[in-house]
Amino acid sequence: MDMGKLPRISEKISNISEKAVRYALVGIVAVMTVIIIFQVFLRYLFLFSLSWSEEVARYLMIWASFLGASLAVKYGLHIGVEYLVNRFPPGPKRAVAFVAKVSILLFLVFFTVGGLQVAWALRDQDSPALLFSMFYAYLSAPVGGVFMIIQIWNSIVEDWVK
């Protein structure tokens, strides 16, 4: 592959992944909102509570957190220790930022692989109210990890070609 095309390909994959995550988050938040409003409505007007609504909302919130983290990676919104880095001159500052991003990438690879191993190990465990495999709840970590890897990779490529 021509290395000149890498930044464009990386950016395209990053943008497609961002769009997919945004659509997923809109759907997740919409479903979560409807379920919670319906639950509150039933509880206060009819003194009836759904056994599964809080569990669904909890798992949707977990999915939203991991997916949303990839958008925070793309836009550099995660907490960072910039005080020390900003004291460096431009050359070393760029090198430190590059090493930090590569370290984050390596962490995310381990996080994603570890998350997949945990999800697989818990595939036979059922959730308390819904009785579906906990694999799907724990799958949020590796899926979010993949989307974060895509975004940090794109950031590394962008920094490399500057």
Language model: regions and residue ranges:
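Alpha-helical transmembrane segments and membrane-interface helix-loop junctions
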Residues: 1-162
